[in-house]
Design a protein with these regions (language model features):
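Interfacial helix-cap and linker-helix signal at transmembrane-aqueous boundaries
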Residues: 22-39, 116-117, 148-149, 253-261
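Helix-loop-helix hairpin linking two adjacent transmembrane segments in secondary transporters
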Residues: 8-66
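Juxtamembrane intracellular "pre-TM" segments in multi-pass secondary transporters
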Residues: 67-95, 301-306
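Residue-level signature of mid-helix packing/kink "hotspots" within the transmembrane helices
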Residues: 17-18, 135-143, 246-247
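Extracytoplasmic gate region of multi-pass secondary transporters
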Residues: 89-140
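C-terminal transmembrane helical hairpin of 12-TM major facilitator-type secondary transporters
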Residues: 155-219
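Intracellular juxtamembrane helix-capping segments at the cytosolic ends
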Residues: 1, 214-227
Length: 307
């Protein structure tokens, strides 16, 4: 049940959704310059102070309620030995997968409110609520993704998740527009008009969040299977690079939008990222099949008539 356990742990990402739901009403419901209970300032400053109080409460709960004797399986290993797996290309491949699932999730969660307001002309509060519809499944489905990885295998779930992201982003990246045909008499007619409405967009982004939530669990299911003695070092690197992906993707979104002029180019970036991950993973699977089971590989690649 490693996949399920890691998925439950990772479902803490749902805190981003809670912030999207709770933050705007709290900011709007407090008065800038006022003070509540002597410690809570009004306006946007209310949020970080409330967060600091919650951190203190969580720290106290951790201190008093968690076991004080930590399990440290790598305590006897020197640091160089613990970091040795980082020389393997597999670790960096897992990291790229996590950039596609977690880094893209973080980047899109930050990008979507502005996208909604600019392209669908809705308020900030409505944009935050619609963004939460994407964030909730991307977080809460992580335990289910772990369960599916335990049952069907992490690699199969990766194929499903990346394939789903590929199809969804291919639809979302199509720009709104139409073909204009000029006629000999000087008139013009529009043909093949395409424009995605708010409801279809929200549904597709919701499905994209589902694929990301399941995929995040599948990536971390790989780590204890391939690196049982270095889960901390490998998991830390994979998580770090996934977080860095969430930092670098928004500027890339902005650059592609400025270069192309299409707001939907955001999803073109995610489409390319999904393609790279899917091709790298499939190429690795094919190479492993030829190396470890050459007879089976030849049988699969033979045409039916030759078998």
């Amino acid at each position: 049940h490693q996949g399920f356990a890691l998925g439950v742990f990772g479902a803490g990402n749902v805190g981003a959704s809670v912030t999207k739901f709770v933050g705007p009403p709290l900011i709007a419901g407090t008065t800038v310059g006022a003070t509540y209970l002597g410690i809570f300032p009004g306006g946007w400053r209310f949020i970080p102070v409330l967060y600091a109080v919650l951190l203190v409460i969580m720290g106290a709960m951790t201190w008093f309620m968690s076991p004080h004797a930590d399990r440290m399986p790598g305590a006897a290993q020197p640091l160089s030995q613990q970091l040795a797996p980082l020389k393997q290309i597999r670790v960096w491949r897992f990291s790229l997968y996590y950039v596609a699932f977690f880094g893209a999730y973080v980047a899109l969660a930050a990008w979507l409110p502005t996208y909604y307001m600019d392209n669908f002309d809705i308020s900030l509060q409505s944009a935050a609520y619609l963004t939460a519809i994407y964030i909730f499944p991307a977080s809460l489905l992580r335990p289910y993704g772990g369960y599916l990885s335990d049952r069907f295998g992490a690699r199969r779930i990766m194929y499903w998740s990346l394939g789903g992201m590929l199809v969804i982003t291919a639809v979302l990246m199509m720009p709104n527009g139409h073909i204009v045909i000029d006629h000999a008499d000087g008139s013009q007619t529009d043909h093949l008009g395409y424009a995605i409405g708010l409801t279809p967009f929200v549904i597709l982004v919701f499905l994209l969040g589902c694929a990301m939530g399941v995929g995040k669990a599948a990536v971390f299911k790989h780590i204890p299977e391939y690196f049982p003695d270095n889960v901390g070092a490998v998991g830390g690197l994979v998580g770090m690079l996934g977080g860095l992906g969430g930092f670098f993707l928004p500027p890339l979104f902005a650059y592609t939008k400025a270069w192309s002029g299409f707001p939907s180019s955001t999803f073109f970036v995610l489409f390319l990222l999904s393609v790279v991950c899917l091709l790298w993973m499939h190429g690795t699977v094919v190479r492993m099949l030829h190396t470890e089971s050459p007879g089976l590989a030849r049988h699969i690649e033979q045409p039916p008539v030759a078998r």
